[in-house]
Each structure stands twice: as structure tokens, then as C-alpha cells.
């Protein structure tokens, strides 16, 4: 199975759960974890996420925020080997139950592109997938969230899919 990588320039591609453990939504000093209040049902699903926090209000008006539908014939594909993802070991891994999913705190990974290098902040799972590929949801999606100088690229892998997408945030 061949994986392809696509770079999508999105203004606000990282969702509330994806921000956890980054400079925009740091972990608490005492180790407690706030439980997320979003879900994937009709009344709490993606179309209502903008109302969870006043800071999300712009999401009700935009077209480039999570969740998105990745249309494979409308994207620019990265050249082979132009993106490097590395997690050398799983030492000191921590698991956190956020109420809406499992987050894995593993900070020794990197994502390197032709223009930047990013440090892994965390990764977490969505079931079903948060995003769609050609209008299709998948059973599960994993988001690897990276950070460098306030930029938050997200490497997303959907199960049952050969697509690997990187959202440059």
C-alpha cells in the first residue's frame, strides 16, 4: 500500500482537541485534564463546535476549518521524501483520557519539511474519522500534532485509507 502526502494550506485546521498540550492550550501544571465537551452526534457534532468557546466563533463563517473534506483531485501533492516524520522511541509516554478520546503524550518525535522542523506535542485518535476524504468518513483517524513557533501542523492518518494528509497550520 502506497501512502501519499498532500500539503493543504488551511487557516484554522486544528480542532480543539488537537490544540491540547500545545502553546495555545497547555496542559495544567497540576496534571489534571479538562474533559472535552464536543462529540460527533447531530446536536454536538462538527457543525456546532464553533459554539463551544467564544474563541471559535469565526469557525461558523469560514470554509477552511476542521472538519474538512479532502478532495484528492483538488490538492497539491508533496514530492517524494520532502516530508520526514520520525518518532525514535516511545520512552516516557503518557496516556490521557480527554473524555472524547485518548491522547498520547510523546514529545520526542519530529516532522521535517523543506522549510521547517516541528516537535511532536501529542497524538490522539478520533472515531469515526474527523475529516473526510472524497466525502467518505473512515472508522478511525489519528492526528499527530506538532509545533514550532506557534505553528501547528497536523499529520493525519485515516484507517482504511491510503491517504496521508498534512495540514500546514
Task: Give names to the regions the model predicted.
Residues 2-4, 9-169:
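Alpha-carbonic anhydrase
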